[in-house]
Swiss-Prot record:
This is Non-structural protein 1. Belongs to the influenza A viruses NS1 family. Inhibits post-transcriptional processing of cellular pre-mRNA, by binding and inhibiting two cellular proteins that are required for the 3'-end processing of cellular pre-mRNAs: the 30 kDa cleavage and polyadenylation specificity factor (CPSF4) and the poly(A)-binding protein 2 (PABPN1). This results in the accumulation of unprocessed 3' end pre-mRNAs which can't be exported from the nucleus. Cellular protein synthesis is thereby shut off very early after virus infection. Homodimer. Interacts with host TRIM25 (via coiled coil); this interaction specifically inhibits TRIM25 multimerization and TRIM25-mediated RIGI CARD ubiquitination. Interacts with human EIF2AK2/PKR, CPSF4, IVNS1ABP and PABPN1. It comes from Influenza A virus (strain A/RI/5-/1957 H2N2). The gene is NS.
Amino acid sequence: MDPNTVSSFQVDCFLWHVRKQVADQELGDAPFLDRLRRDQKSLRGRGSTLGLNIETATRVGKQIVERILKEESDEALKMTMASAPASRY
């Protein structure tokens, strides 16, 4: 199994968890909530295909994201945000 596939799945699980917390605080609009539901189904399918536990993958994904953020400088983050495409919504 490709390690990048596993890492991508782990990060996707953690980011879904963060988005779920946003929804739980009633901060998401209808398109956000629709994507959240679709992505949950997709993650379940991917987890099954990869034979990975979603809860474990979420914890590892959190560690990956924390490591990246720790290494990321504030200036690089500003540049990344400035170059991100605008949302369609």
